[in-house]
Structure formats: structure tokens, C-alpha cells
Amino acid sequence: MASLSLKNVCKVYPNGFEAVKDFNLEIQDQEFIIFVGPSGCGKSTTLRMIAGLEDISSGELKIGDRVVNDVEPKDRDIAMVFQNYALYPHMSVYDNMAFGLKLRKVPKDEIDKMVKDAAKILDLTPLLDRKPKALSGGQRQRVAMGRAIVRNPKVFLMDEPLSNLDAKLRVQMRIEIAKLHQRLGTTIIYVTHDQTEAMTLGTRIVVMKDGVIQQVDTPQNLYEKPCNLFVAGFMGSPQMNFLDATVEVAGDVANLKIAGHSIPLPPAKSKKLIDGGYDGKVVTFGIRPEDVYDSEMYIEASPNSVFESTIKVYELLGAEVYLYFDLEEFPVTARVDSRTTARPGDTVRFALDVEKIHVFDKDTEQVITN
């Protein structure tokens, strides 16, 4: 197994387009690292540079203690699993998994043991004699993973491996990949645009935008302490609500003025706004849907953060409901208990959990209060 180090790594194409800009990251042995971001953010390009499928324009890439910028992909001791399974249709599952080992002229008895061991891990043993056309999408993806496992690489690279699966299979395969990481104890770098995969699988997540790292952190910290407006809006579904408000300082309390209301912030958040000289300035504040309440008990406990609005849309998702309404010109989503009596057209009171408010600079979009 191995650690990885990327120092000042850049990718510039001949037309001058910078796909990856000054990428710096230290990955520890056995970590499960997720690269996440919107399409075109540079996450797959970075993975391909690690794999050796894209040249590094500048910077240094180390796998273990070895600089591998100019090392051929086959000599980097990595294995890739792609979005497309790329299985040989005329070969059995066994032969698909064994093919790379045969090319490397590994002894036949070793190949047999490695393939059967990997098949056992992935629950493929009953399927070893089948052809890919007789397999489900999830089974085919497990075969693709098995083909990577038999190589016993130092690092697994996975490029959106679940994108071609339906929703139910994606959930099942997510669990399988998590179990696989626990069993193998190997380093995994995983690319996805799906934040659910990122939050559930990663030990750390690298959020990217326009080829630049926005934040590297644990899933919980990314969710609870986003460093800027982009990360706050990208992580979480439904996404964080964003509203503009004017800061008004009274003594040692900073208030957010919006829709005729003045929301007093807790001491720590107030201090950061006051120390930053935000009195009288317009800021953007964010609140997650689950921190917007319609229960009377919470409303009575938080009288200074109560708003009234008319429900526009009601979405029932079993145990919870999404309520959509406006606060001035800003759309707001609340995630509430399914036992709510609120329905479209109803005027409802809501309270915000002021402890969970995030305040961002209007110009730089950097967080002020975390």
C-alpha cells in the first residue's frame, strides 16, 4: 500500500486551457479520498494524471517515495476502475479477471488463487463461468473491480464507477465499495459528481471547482464548516438556503436584518462580524433546510428568528417533507417532519436555528463565521 503526494500539479492543454491549477494534496496510506465537483472541474483530469493517462504540465507526483511524473502507467502499481466496465464480451468472468495477469505471465496456479480470492471477496464465485451478457449491471461492475483487485495494486483509482447503475444498485454498490476498502485496507482515490457517494464513502473529500481545490476536509466538517459559498451550496441535498441581509451591530451583538426582522447572532458569530468590520454591510447568510423549523415548540423557543410565509410546494418523501416558500425575493426550503399539517397555500410560521447560520462575505464569498 502507499501514500501519495501531489505538489503544485498543473495541467495546461496546448490551446492554453488550464484544467488543473496548482493542485496540492497529501494522501495517507489506506485513505479513501474523494474528488468531487461539478462537470469540468478537473477531478477526472487529476485522476488521469495520477494514473499516467494524462501528462503533468508542471508539479510533482509521488506514489510512496518515488516520483512518477514520467513513469509509464503499467509501472506505477495502480489499478483503475472506470465508469464503463470494458469487459471482454467473449470471455468468462474468470478470464476477464485473469486477463491482465496472463499478459504479465504470472504462473497459472497463482492466477487461479488470485482470481478465486478476489471472486470470494466480491461474491462472484458462482458467476465465474458466465459471460458478461449474462450479468446484471452491478455484477459487471464487481467484475471490473475484481480485475483491479487481482493486481494487488498500491492504489485504486475509481472514476465514477457507479454512474451507469440505477439508483437501487448504486446504493448496494456503495456499500460493497465501503466493505471492500475495509477488507483490503488499501488507498483509494474516487472521482464522483454525486455528493451522496462523496459523503458516505470518503475519509476525506476534495471539493473542486474550475480546476482549483476549494476545500479538503472530512465529510462532517465539509457539511458543518464549509469554507465558502460554493462548498456550502454544493454539499447537501436539498442545498443550503442563501439569503442576503444587512448587518446591524448593537453593543456586542450582530443582528441580521431581513424582511423587517432582526435576527441576533450568537456571541461567537457576532464577534467575528464585529471584528471584521461588517456593521452596516450586506452579507449572504446560509441555513440548511433541516435547520428551518415549523414546530410550535421550536418557534416559541426562538422568537427572534421567526418568519411567516406562504407554502408554494409540498413534497412528501416518506419520513420527511420538503416545504418550499419565499422570504422576500429569496427561495427557501425547509426539511420538516412528515407529520406537518402545512400544505400549499397555507401561511406558516418558521424559526431558524441561529446556531447553524453560516455568514459569507458578499464579495469574496468566503465564510466569516466558521
Language-model features: locations:
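Glycine/charge-rich catalytic "coupling/switch" loops of P-loop NTPases
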Residues: 253-311, 341-370
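Helix-to-loop junction immediately C-terminal to a conserved catalytic motif
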Residues: 51
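Short coil-to-beta microelement around the adenine-binding A-loop and adjacent beta1/P-loop entry
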Residues: 16-18
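ABC ATPase nucleotide-binding domains
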Residues: 73-234
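Conserved post-Walker A/P-loop segment of ABC ATPase nucleotide-binding domains
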Residues: 54-62
